[in-house]
Design a protein with these regions (language model features):
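Hydrophobic alpha-helical transmembrane segments of membrane proteins
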Residues: 1-63, 81-216
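Alpha-helix N-cap/helix-start motif at helix boundaries, enriched for small hydrophobics
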Residues: 77-79
Length: 216
């Protein structure tokens, strides 16, 4: 599995201009105003996490995936590497952009509003992992290009359904915000982490099964 990580790290090195551009955009957003800190962290976290999906596209190019399967690498190890890569990129992206936000805003501003905003952005990590939980099995089964489009359609449907339910129930953004603020943050965080771990592991199991049935 180490070889798979080395391969994907080399792929990321080839895309270093892309990552530098994303980081620069994050710095600009952080400097734009206090309200942009959370957006910058969320943007960088999701964009970086998606690269785990992009590596599958590179693997499939010119029958590269079929060649990889002739090496001493099992299909389960291949899928495991993608899920570990996705989780690692997500955590690293959040950490890098959070540090960038602190540097851009100044350490002094950590007392109060900025620290609360950065802590609040921790929610982007499970959200990015849930996005990968849906997308990775689809990409593994249908291929990078088709799987990416299907995942986009699925997320659009999910968002539309949630939005419709909120409107049907007559809930306002303020009401939802007030309800969330009334919850125990520690319990909510623990619940979100547990739910994300269960879904991510379940997605990994599905991904392995799909990969084992895949023909090259």
């Amino acid at each position: 599995m180490k070889g798979l990580f080395v391969k994907d790290i080399e792929l990321m090195k080839q895309q270093k201009q892309y990552f530098i551009l994303v980081i620069v955009m994050g710095v600009i957003l952080n400097l734009a105003g206090s309200g942009s800190v959370s957006f910058a962290i969320g943007y960088f976290t999701f964009v970086t996490a998606i690269f785990a999906i992009t590596t599958i596209s590179y693997d499939e190019f010119d029958n590269g995936l079929a060649f990889l399967m002739t090496l001493p690498v099992t299909r389960k190890q291949y899928v495991a590497e993608k899920y570990l890569l996705g989780a690692g990129l997500t955590a690293a992206a959040w950490g890098i952009e959070a540090i960038t936000g602190v540097i851009c805003k100044g350490v002094a501003e950590l007392q109060g509003c900025l620290s609360e905003k950065i802590i609040g952005t921790l929610i982007y990590i499970p959200l990015a992992l849930l996005m990968l939980s849906v997308s990775l099995p689809l990409v593994i089964h249908f291929g990078a290009e088709k799987g990416r489009y299907i995942a986009m359609v699925m997320w659009a449907i999910i968002i539309a359904v949630v939005y419709a339910l909120i409107n049907t129930m007559g809930l306002s953004a303020d009401a939802v915000d007030a309800w969330l603020n009334g919850l125990n943050r520690g319990m909510v965080l623990a619940g979100v982490v547990l739910f994300t771990v269960i879904v991510y592991m379940g997605s990994f199991w599905i991904g392995v099964r799909l990969m084992e049935k895949k023909e090259f």
